[in-house]
Amino acid sequence: MAQKPLRLLACGDVEGKFDILFNRVQAIQKKSGNFDLLLCVGNFFGSTQDAEWEEYKTGIKKAPIQTYVLGANNQETVKYFQDADGCELAENITYLGRKGIFTGSSGLQIVYLSGTESLNEPVPGYSFSPKDVSSLRMMLCTTSQFKGVDILLTSPWPKCVGNFGNSSGEVDTKKCGSALVSSLATGLKPRYHFAALEKTYYERLPYRNHIILQENAQHATRFIALANVGNPEKKKYLYAFSIVPMKLMDAAELVKQPPDVTENPYRKSGQEASIGKQILAPVEESACQFFFDLNEKQGRKRSSTGRDSKSSPHPKQPRKPPQPPGPCWFCLASPEVEKHLVVNIGTHCYLALAKGGLSDDHVLILPIGHYQSVVELSAEVVEEVEKYKATLRRFFKSRGKWCVVFERNYKSHHLQLQVIPVPISCSTTDDIKDAFITQAQEQQIELLEIPEHSDIKQIAQPGAAYFYVELDTGEKLFHRIKKNFPLQFGREVLASEAILNVPDKSDWRQCQISKEDEETLARRFRKDFEPYDFTLDD
């Protein structure tokens, strides 16, 4: 079965014209259906019109699509980007960060580099340096398995991009743009590369990433420069396209060459030779944004040098999770843990029966170390959390049950992923989703559906309070907690007449049983779960 393509929009310089942009996006979606993401390059903010931005910042208005933006290109707009590692600017609008790799739950890989080129030290807050470009290349290009990335986002054009290609109009690509971006594009081999800043639209003919008859065929790259939003000449500033992540594509299909493909504009331009030594110098530690894909089974955290922690000959010691300020009921090494409830132990996580559970097989996935929420987990812990979730889904499905997972990062000190089975005979996944949405509306809780190909780490920052629920279908609902939040909300929904029909069990304190009964349930669960226990494979 063919993989369903993602539908994306890319945009040039917004320059503070948010209403024009988002009204246009709404019109496109009304006509052509919803898109998954909007990617903005160039200047997102302008020098004026702060009043318009305030409406989005305060929630009076909301972007109609999950939007990711690059950072400042001048000193004037640095003030809008408070966190170099990326942050949420407004609801549905996220600043990616100065540089890094963004991987969606679909496997789509986007590399981003904010700012303009600077060869001076110290580097201004709105610029990138040769070291920044080198670190991005080393993150990916040092492994023999590397084939390229899906999308590259930069604000400046790459220098000499017009070589061997169609005319770029009034822009002289030999003088305009960044040689560092040219080098980055050469190394990363993006399938799509978007840029802006030149107030014009230019879609270059696709170029090849291999030398004919000397190298194996590789995919082609399409470079698209976009104009500024609302420009009077009506130059194109929005670009719609569909893409299947390259990791999911058949190799032969991926490397098919378009009929109008050209030579690589950078290979013979001398750009790589002239700056190669400069950008491939050793990289110092630097702040670099990483998004960990909760559905990326092989996800690994890369250091700012780009070396894979599992393959480096001199790996750094993994950073220990933060220590709890006092006794913690859920840190596995803590004497406060009720160890008779523990039913399975992995390398980074463990499984325990819930105390006062909604059912006899209501379990928790917990990190062994002290982490407060999913968004704070390291890559290796995320990977094992996902492994437990997938295994529990198979386990419960074999027993005729759905699997509902939720997290409440509010008034809790240690991550607890609640995993509650719901008999398939009781409810459909649509029933479960509707129950959450209905009860949220009744309690004036804004429960939003996360776009299918986003994950929670892209929406919530470490330390932010939130509630999050995930269904067997992969659908995810999210609420950003701003003030008060009912602590038992997740249980109340599942205990309601619409789902499990045990409303008297909405509070766990009313469901406690004796330690002997808990031990009996734990023994039974261990025995039933054993055929699915992936820890026995190690």
Curated annotation (Swiss-Prot):
Q: Where is this region: Disordered?
A: 298-324
Under CDD domains, the record lists: MPP_CWF19_N
What InterPro entries has UniProt attached to this entry? Cwf19-like, Cwf19-like_C_dom-1, Cwf19-like_C_dom-2, HIT-like_sf
Tell me which domain of life the UniProt entry assigns to the organism this sequence originates from: Eukaryota
Q: Coiled-coil regions in this chain?
A: none
- Provide the family line: Belongs to the CWF19 family.
Per its record, how is this protein called by name? Answer: CWF19-like protein 1
Organism, per UniProt? Homo sapiens
